[in-house]
């Protein structure tokens, strides 16, 4: 699909959390690089920079996600980074500074966004009868969002 879209001059974007990236699998990497050759922009969620904390939050390591960001940057593909801000979970100042350091090391980042956690989809979980994984989470205040934007150096990347 991306190949056809790009052939017609259509801008293509991949919005991903990066979890399936497998840099040690040559077949996967070849297919991924073919996709990237037809991708105008990648929007990547970085939930947590610390591998152990990421594992606690998601059940998965983040090494492949960070490797994906680096690989995309090395390929020269424009990159937007998003960070969902959940008070008490993803707002630790030291880890946000480390995230900013990592982002700064990437060559093609055009934009960094802080996405404030919200409960707009909570009704879907309730309707399906599925326990909501963040029952005690609350949206961040405007001040918390502003502080995260400062720590992540959002203004460096006007996108």
What is each PLM-predicted segment?
Residues 154-159:
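Radical SAM enzyme core and accessory elements
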Residues 1-115, 120:
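Conserved AdoMet/S-adenosylmethionine-binding subsite of the radical SAM
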Residues 101-104, 110, 126-152:
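A structural motif corresponding to the C-terminal lobe/cap of the Radical SAM core domain
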């Amino acid at each position: 699909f991306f190949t056809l879209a790009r052939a017609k001059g259509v801008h293509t974007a991949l919005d991903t959390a990066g979890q399936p990236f497998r840099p040690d699998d040559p077949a996967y990497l070849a297919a991924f690089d073919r996709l990237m050759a037809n991708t105008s922009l990648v929007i990547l969620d970085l939930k947590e920079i610390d591998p152990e904390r990421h594992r606690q939050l998601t059940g998965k390591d983040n090494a492949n996600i960070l490797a994906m960001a680096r690989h995309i940057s090395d390929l020269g593909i424009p990159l937007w980074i998003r960070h969902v801000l959940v008070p008490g979970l993803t707002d630790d100042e030291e880890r946000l500074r480390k995230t900013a350091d990592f982002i700064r090391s990437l060559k093609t980042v055009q934009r960094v966004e802080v996405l404030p956690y919200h409960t707009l989809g909570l009704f879907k979980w309730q309707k399906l009868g599925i326990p909501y994984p963040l029952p005690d989470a609350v949206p961040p205040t405007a001040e918390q969002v502003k502080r995260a934007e400062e720590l992540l150096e959002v203004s460096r990347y006007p996108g």
